[in-house]
């Protein structure tokens, strides 16, 4: 029952008792809460509508309206209104979610003064295109604000975050992989994303900064941190000279230390530090579960009792206490008699101690002579252990793959094959069959150069989800293999097969594909390589998607559709009639210097991305509308 229907009933009874009785009736039927919700919602919509229609003072709006802001509501605002709303968010110190900030950023004017920039929420600036601030002074001011923002609003290794880091380094004048303390301060949270090559060449500056980073380091960063700390050529000195204060200063970097570094730290220092952090475990959080056992084992090591040192692996070891196994058993003896280790029914805890002894004996990885004899002991090694190995025998690989079958050891099996390929081995059909129960996502774990050893026939088995974690280089190589595998297939059947691999297709290949009426779905479109996609015109994308072109609207604020929109002229997008926004406004000229930023091993310069500039004097000559 709607409220207008209720009013005459209330009005027809002059008695307060009658009114109260009617309200009780409504309450018992559950109508009052609905009426309240409807009234509140209508009131909020009216307030927001009033603001959109001319209420200049956004700061007077209730905080709840900001927190519930949707992209649809933002899209109805003018650029000036969006700017006022964003400034009110900063003024009221409201924390919006990432998608809300992105929507607001897209509706802001293309030209912002320093004063306007200063008045915007810091986290919102993360979603602005750095190309909006050309010139040293403008970019320096922009990135001085970015350095104070919470960069973790953007996912690690996301395209937006990578672009911000590239442009920040370029603005700072950093070329190559050397950064100064001033550079790191200017980068702020973005410095946590600097690749391992920067860590290796700027360890004095970066190590203290990385120690305070919230997110986990990537593989290249961890490797570089370990190498520079192991060398002793840092402000912390060699691990053998470290103190409790040194370990405190390392903070989260303690979690990346390997066995060889931990063993070099004085035992009394480790014991004291363990007591120190046990009083306040929150300082290291979840990292404590990784660090504590590693340090405790080494700190509490005792001497072997007289007469207890074994000279062979036998059943007597079953009755040793764990600390006696730690103190008395020799790793080289275990390696020589691995067949006996597998035969005797040792407990899981005892086998873990044996593994620790082997790891200490071979800190750089097990020799192949031991790997060949591992047998069932292979179940106790980790993928990280295997990455250190050098395996050249295909028989060894096949034997260990049989051991791992049905043991939930996919990661170890993949690491083993990758290790074998890295040593120059070839992936034959027997190995592919042995890996048959493992999702083909393992292709992404192989190094790009090792993919050449993968038979083309495997491409017939690959599904879209198998390539989700592949790098761009992986996708490019797998795409070429897929083209070879499907060369005798044509028409729509070819498209159905090749679309899984289109993330590695070049812009030339995509242009050719657009001529065949494939009607690509939006899910496949989103997996296309950004560098290839942005090279396509509006007309080419329209041909590529066919009737699915309408789905662009739902993805316009997400990569890669957003990146493609940034490179198109707004007038061309308007012709689609989909209401797509974010294109290049009339009066702007796109200069693409086509110089790639290089965080790869082959390049040392950071090149500029595309830049939008306005040149009034050239407009008549260039006939820009």
From Swiss-Prot:
Entry keywords, A to Z: Cell adhesion, Cell membrane, Cleavage on pair of basic residues, Disulfide bond, Glycoprotein, Golgi apparatus, GPI-anchor, Lipoprotein, Membrane, Phosphoprotein, Secreted, Signal
Glycan-bearing residues: 93, 390, 488, 517
A cellular component term, taken from the record's GO annotations: plasma membrane
Post-translational modification remark: Proteolytically cleaved by a furin-like convertase to generate megakaryocyte-potentiating factor (MPF), and the cleaved form of mesothelin.
Summary of the tissues where the protein is detected: Highly expressed in lung and heart. Expressed at low levels in spleen, liver, kidney and testis. Present in lung (at protein level).
Family: Belongs to the mesothelin family.
The protein's name in its UniProt record: Mesothelin
Source species taxonomy: Eukaryota, Metazoa, Chordata, Craniata, Vertebrata
